[in-house]
């Protein structure tokens, strides 16, 4: 049900967000203000990716365990390279790109809670897997937004984690006994039919911080919920990164690894990026036609999320038809959610009959 609400995000949502932060950086034309959606006629009339993509049109993801400084490094890299920074997608990412941008209630956001997961990861109400499933969908939506921005403007993007690294949490949850094998199977099936449509990042930056140091940082941060995270869970996340994620990504893209101390020097990291040749991975095989189809996909948020809902009964993520109908109608009664943006009088939209 929650995914149905997520799909209600208008196709232009990401474009509106991107446009709000668009700017000219180092000669990159980053305006995405457009009246019509991209389609076949615009492609035939010459609107092709090769005209705007340059050597600085890159997708970079910054990965690492919890509290490793990913956000700080990602933001600094983006500023120094003139890229757009996408903060890590959380539970409320769909809210941030639709409506008034304010977080909505849990009923409209996967009916899950990160705080509850930290407090009771073995909760028998299915919160743990609902959380992981919802976060994957949020990251999928954000990755499509990042690619849409790249293909529309030519400006590079920097993300904190992505759909390609999301599984490290699933592995840790399963190894710790937080979720059932059926949940893992469901996740892998959803992932297999969604991630295949997307190109991996050009570069993955991994910040390697030992688990004891991660725990020290969590304690210093002082979040009462995060402080309950066990060292075993953190170690499983690290193992998934080092044993599975990094070896797999090293075959698809460039990979840079830094210690906690090295990651603090963003200037040195940017210098390392400048020296990379970017001479491997599927991006090298793309042409105007393949990028045209990719752009059509990522601008259509309904299609992006379509296969995250598969017809499999799993108690953790399944609710009844009556509850679905009730929540959907409640969602439609929220200010600005009944009609497309610009057509809701209750939030001040005017001259609707002229649009």
UniProtKB/Swiss-Prot annotation:
Modified-residue entries (Phosphoserine), positions: 250
- Keyword Transferase annotated: no
GO terms in the biological process aspect are: mitochondrial electron transport, NADH to ubiquinone
Q: Which note does the record give on the cofactor? A: Binds 1 FAD per subunit.
Q: Give the Pfam families listed for this entry.
A: dNK
Transit peptide location on this chain: 1-35
Q: How is it modified after translation?
A: Phosphorylation at Ser-250 by PINK1 is required for the binding and/or reduction of the complex I substrate ubiquinone.
Q: Does the keyword Transport apply?
A: yes
Its GO CC terms are:
mitochondrial matrix; respiratory chain complex I
Sorted keywords for this record are: Electron transport, FAD, Flavoprotein, Mitochondrion, Phosphoprotein, Respiratory chain, Transit peptide, Transport
N6-succinyllysine PTM positions: 285
Which segments cross the bilayer?
A: none
Essential cofactor(s)? FAD
Localization, UniProt: Mitochondrion matrix
Principal cellular location given in the protein's record: mitochondrion
Q: Which CDD domains match?
A: NDUO42
By sequence similarity, the record places it as follows:
Belongs to the complex I NDUFA10 subunit family.
Under the subunit heading, UniProt states:
Complex I is composed of 45 different subunits. This a component of the hydrophobic protein fraction.
Functional note: Accessory subunit of the mitochondrial membrane respiratory chain NADH dehydrogenase (Complex I), that is believed not to be involved in catalysis. Complex I functions in the transfer of electrons from NADH to the respiratory chain. The immediate electron acceptor for the enzyme is believed to be ubiquinone.
Task: Please state what the protein is called.
Answer: NADH dehydrogenase [ubiquinone] 1 alpha subcomplex subunit 10, mitochondrial
């Amino acid at each position: 049900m929650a995914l149905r609400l997520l799909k209600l995000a208008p196709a232009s949502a990401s474009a509106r967000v991107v446009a709000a932060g668009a700017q000219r950086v180092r000669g990159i034309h980053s305006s995405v203000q457009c009246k019509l959606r991209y389609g076949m006629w615009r492609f035939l009339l010459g609107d092709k990716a090769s005209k705007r993509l340059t050597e600085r049109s890159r997708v970079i993801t910054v990965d690492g365990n919890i509290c490793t400084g990913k956000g700080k490094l990602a933001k600094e890299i983006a500023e120094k390279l003139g890229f757009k920074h996408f903060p890590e997608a959380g539970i409320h990412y769909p809210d941030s790109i639709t409506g008034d941008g304010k977080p909505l209630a849990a009923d409209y956001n996967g009916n899950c809670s990160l705080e509850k997961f930290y407090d009771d990861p073995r909760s028998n109400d299915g919160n743990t897997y609902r959380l992981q499933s919802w976060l994957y969908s949020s990251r999928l939506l954000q990755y499509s937004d990042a690619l849409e921005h790249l293909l529309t403007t030519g400006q590079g993007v920097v993300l904190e984690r992505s759909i390609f690294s999301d599984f490290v949490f699933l592995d840790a949850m399963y190894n710790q006994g937080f979720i059932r094998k059926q949940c893992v199977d469901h996740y892998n099936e959803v992932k297999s039919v969604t991630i295949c449509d997307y190109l991996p990042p050009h570069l993955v930056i991994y910040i390697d911080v030992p688990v004891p140091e991660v725990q020290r940082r969590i304690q210093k941060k002082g979040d009462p919920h995060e402080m309950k995270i066990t060292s075993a869970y953190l170690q499983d996340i690290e193992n998934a990164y080092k044993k599975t994620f990094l070896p797999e990504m090293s075959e698809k893209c460039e990979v840079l690894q830094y210690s906690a101390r090295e990651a603090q020097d963003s200037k040195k990291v940017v210098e390392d990026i400048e020296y990379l040749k970017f001479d491997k991975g599927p991006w090298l095989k793309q042409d105007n036609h393949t990028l045209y189809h990719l752009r059509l996909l990522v601008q259509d948020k309904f299609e992006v999320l379509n296969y995250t809902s598969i017809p499999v009964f799993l108690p953790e993520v399944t609710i009844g038809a009556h509850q679905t109908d009730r929540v959907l109608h409640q969602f439609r009664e929220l200010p600005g959610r009944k009609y497309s943006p610009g057509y809701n009088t209750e939030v001040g939209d005017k001259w609707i009959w002229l649009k």
